Amino acid sequence: MFGGIIVLRKLFLLLLILSFFATASTCRRRNTDAVTVSLSEKFTAFDTLTSAASDVAAERVKSLMFNALVKKDANFDYVGELAKEIKTSEDGKTITFVLQDNVKFHNGKAFTSADVKYTFDELFKSNGFKSGAFFDTVPDDSSPAATPPKTIDNSNGAKTPAEPKTKRVAHISSIETPDAKTVIFTVTRPALRNQLLANLVAIPIIPTDSAAQQKDTPVGSGPFKFVAFDASQNIVELEANTEYWDGAPKIPKLRVKTVTDAQSLQNELQAGGVDIAPLPTNLPPDVLKAMNGSGNLKVDQFDGSNIQYLVFNAQSPPLNNPKIRQAIGYAIDRQKIVSQLLFDQAKPASSILPPQSWAYSPGTQYTFDQARSKQLLQEAGYKGEPITFKYGAGNAATNQYAQVIQSALNDVGLNVRIETLEVNTIRQQLAQGQFQIYTGQWVGGNQDPIFLRDLFSSTKIPGGSVSCCNRSRYQNAEVDKLVEEAVNSVDRAKAKELYGKTWDIVSSELPLLPLWYPGNM
């Protein structure tokens, strides 16, 4: 899902583009039938179904070419996309999808239930990044626990709590296709229905026998069709799917290219080389403000639900002490950053979940208080140990606010240094726990409270068969219990209460600090 700022040219085509990008963009119309879209990160693969790791840029391109069985509506509820009807059995374990009529893939093949079954067979055969969402990770008592290795950012090595050995248990017991228009998923327990729907959103349905070609020549059922890819320039050419089942796009051609440098993107927008720049983009907020009203450029804003955050390695000294993490929470003036650096293109975050979520709970609030921060550092016995703050290189906006955060932390007596790394290196180090503080943005995933389990359950600490998402390596037995009860509850009111208790504990111990909700513009 897209999130972020939209800078646009004043014309109705913006609305057409937004219908496919689901959020923000920059648009300028030239004398051509092609619209050029810029992304700030390179897309490394088109096959997002079976890929081993997440690729945000590739997911954005994928959203133009593919459909899923399920999508989110404006209220973050799950509704059908390629499914026109979703029915649940009385026992809650059988979910039946009645498929849309008259859907065709880009190769002309009619869409049937066999394609859904084939897609999931390929997904589970690949054991890729997305397949893990359809499994529970549970303790494996047959294997001894493993202690993390000693690293630069985890210098206490053997003193760190042992990582429990785990195994995967499938959510889905069967997928049946009784006829061409019906797919029946059976889950192992009733509470997994909502997890199934949440996970189906990210699964692009592909035609039978097409898996081998998806990497180089993707074929889906979405509004745009793949034409060509220039790997040297990181440019993909798309054309309108004139037989698109949900209404043909009015834009004949779409070009998606990577522009990683902020100045280059600004120049291209002003010169007309780029029409749309969906966020996260690499344009700093001050540039966006200056571009608003410049020529035909305009910035429109509405509330966003994505979350910018700091994640702390809760197993790396001195951040293994909750008081150090709490001190950081009080040291950062988020309202000032939002007002003066982001020019109110965001709202300070009070939770990892957006306020629009049915499970939202504010938890412990960290209002700016330098005196409280210094007191906590004193109570923690902090002696000036160095702390490394890492983030991906190449994004001018991130660089601006990261330096402000570094300065704020050093002002209260912390010894923080910045290290910028290539994005893939950062991802690898996060998975291995080789960091202390990292800043990033979750796009879309935080709209469902199941996200709390992904971020804070000890069963989600990366390692072994687990690739996501408890990057803080946070462990709390009570949180594990509460969040599992919440995820498995079929009573929304009870689940809301349990998720609230979970966030109360987590926000107090603070393995992750919500910063702000970036605006969609």
Predicted regions and their residues:
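Extracytoplasmic/peripheral linker and loop segments enriched in polar/acidic and small residues
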Residues: 28, 411, 415-426, 431, ...
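N-terminal lobe/hinge region of extracytoplasmic solute-binding protein
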Residues: 39-90, 121, 217-221
